Regions:
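C-terminal and inter-domain tail/linker signature
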Residues: 1-134
């Protein structure tokens, strides 16, 4: 996924994902993103909004058929992203995901959590929180 998100090489998606792949993304309309083509579309959407997007794996832990990845995404918000027109603001947000793999090494399921609120604040869509007493 680092190559797909960070470099825009969505061809690796077909090599990595199982044909019945499901991503349980709480930020998607239905809560689920199914299939390689849909994931490719999501990556293209992110990279269109943030063309200089980087995706850095900070840490990974594997146990059994699951891998947990902690990552940081950085870039410049140039085009519409989650309803927010491009601002030119630098955006950096972190995330963590749990991926489950089958015996052949294909990713079958994913449960991501990422700091969309922080990204929206950096884009200027949501005001920064005020400290009590300020």
């Amino acid at each position: 996924m680092e190559e797909a998100f960070g470099q825009g090489n969505t061809n690796v998606i077909d090599e990595v994902l199982h044909s019945e792949f499901v991503c349980y993304d709480p930020n998607s309309e239905s809560g689920e993103i199914r299939g390689a083509d849909t994931i490719k579309g999501e990556i293209e959407y992110f990279r269109n909004a943030v063309p200089d997007l980087t995706y850095t794996v900070e840490d990974q832990v594997a146990e059994g058929d699951k891998v947990v990845t902690r990552y940081t995404t950085r870039g410049t918000h140039q085009r519409e992203f989650f309803g927010v027109a491009g601002t030119g603001n630098r955006v950096e947000f972190t995330g963590i995901q749990i991926d489950r793999f089958d015996k052949s090494g294909k990713m079958v399921e994913e449960w991501p959590e990422y700091d969309l609120l922080g990204a929206m604040r950096q884009m200027g869509a949501i005001p920064e929180a005020q400290q009590p007493g300020s």
